[in-house]
UniProtKB/Swiss-Prot annotation:
The lineage of its organism: Bacteria, Bacillati, Actinomycetota, Actinomycetes, Mycobacteriales. It comes from Rhodococcus jostii (strain RHA1). This is Biotin synthase. The gene is bioB. It catalyses: (4R,5S)-dethiobiotin + (sulfur carrier)-SH + 2 reduced [2Fe-2S]-[ferredoxin] + 2 S-adenosyl-L-methionine = (sulfur carrier)-H + biotin + 2 5'-deoxyadenosine + 2 L-methionine + 2 oxidized [2Fe-2S]-[ferredoxin]. InterPro entries: Aldolase_TIM, BATS_dom, Biotin_synth/BioAB, Biotin_synthase, Elp3/MiaA/NifB-like_rSAM, rSAM. Transmembrane segments: none annotated. PANTHER family: BIOTIN SYNTHASE, BIOTIN SYNTHASE, MITOCHONDRIAL.
Length: 337
């Protein structure tokens, strides 16, 4: 009678595969991590931190974001209060160039190396691109900081224009796994987003692509999303946690439990051992102050400081003080050039 094969513990396997060899966990392995009981969370976070330190180093990249054009978006992303299709309190508004420059100055003062200009649109029109170009030129004249953009889906011509403006990194989130995406957005497809990201990479800009956890996806779909991102190989992955917005289709969803959110952070680190993994929106309501520390000691190596697009973040000083306490240096601007 043959005995059943001995099952290798997923964290022991991850230690040998990811920490020692630098080989990412695959989709089924990520699912095993996500299914771990809460009593193994501390062990999981410690492993994810070790992986981050070995393959990324101790530095933390700091970024600020600003909304150039807020609200009035024609798309129906179910999590977003900036959609013009929902009964949310956000109304369309434009930011003027002097305010944009001042925001960039304040971001740079925090020690940030990256400043991202965001617009709530399906994709940019000529007016928006002209405003972005003027904003980038004005910022460059007064502030020493890398500039990123997040302007929705792009044509090849628009990609080339942004590259010519000197945009360092372009953010366009896939938001969730390919199989779950139709439950989140119906006015465009996951493949349309993927195509924009492909063109951005081919134009020589860095690719920033992540999403939001806690939008009703199953653990299987969360593991699928990690695998989708691993296939894309982005330079940066921002991890958001759903902060349900009043008036949106997802306004009544439950906030992700903190233990599940932290488990997800660690799992994504094990799926993306060399990628910039950024704490983004929703971490305050999902994790609180203690969770910020646990996340940075559990695989995270980048943060957005200050407020987000339509929700409040932690004061920049709190995050920066935390990095000092943890003896984690802020990534300097000259390290990103």
């Amino acid at each position: 009678m043959t005995s059943a094969p001995v099952q290798t513990d997923i964290l022991a396997l991850a230690r040998e595969q990811v920490l020692e060899r630098g080989d990412a966990l695959n989709e089924s392995q990520v699912l095993e991590v996500l299914q771990l009981p809460d009593d193994r969370l501390e062990e999981l976070l410690a492993l994810a931190h070790d992986v981050r330190m070995k393959w990324c180093g101790p530095e933390v990249e700091v970024e600020g974001i600003i909304s150039l054009k807020t609200g009035g978006c024609p798309e129906d992303c179910h999590f977003c209060s900036q959609s013009g299709l929902f009964q949310s309190p956000v109304r369309a508004a434009w930011l003027d160039i002097p305010s944009l420059v001042e925001a960039a100055k304040q971001t740079a003062k925090s020690g940030a190396s990256e400043f991202c200009i965001v617009a709530a649109v399906r994709g940019p029109d000529e007016r928006l691109l002209a405003q972005v170009a003027a904003g980038i030129e004005a910022i460059r004249n007064e502030v020493d900081i890398q500039i990123a953009c997040s302007l929705g889906m792009l044509t090849q011509e628009q990609v080339d224009q942004l590259a010519a403006m000197g945009v360092h990194r372009y953010n366009h989130n896939l938001e969730t796994s390919k199989s779950h995406f139709p439950n989140v957005v119906t006015t465009h497809t996951w493949d349309e987003r993927w195509n924009t990201l492909r063109m951005v990479r081919e134009a020589g800009m860095e690719v920033c692509c992540g999403g939001i956890l806690g939008m009703g996806e199953s653990l299987e779909q969360r593991a699928e999303f990690a695998a989708n991102l691993a296939e894309l190989e982005p330079d940066e992955v921002p991890l958001n946690f759903l902060n349900p917005r009043p008036g949106t289709p997802f306004g009544d969803l439950e906030v992700l439990p903190a233990s599940e959110a932290l488990k997800s952070v660690a799992a994504f680190r094990l799926a993306l051992p060399r990628t910039i993994l950024r704490f983004a929106g929703g971490r305050e309501i999902t994790l609180g102050d203690l969770g910020a520390k646990q996340g940075i000691l559990g695989g995270i190596n980048a943060v957005i400081v200050g407020n987000y697009l339509t929700t409040l973040g932690r004061p920049a000083e709190q995050d920066l003080d935390l990095l000092v306490d943890l003896q984690m240096p802020i990534k300097a601007l000259n390290d990103t050039l």
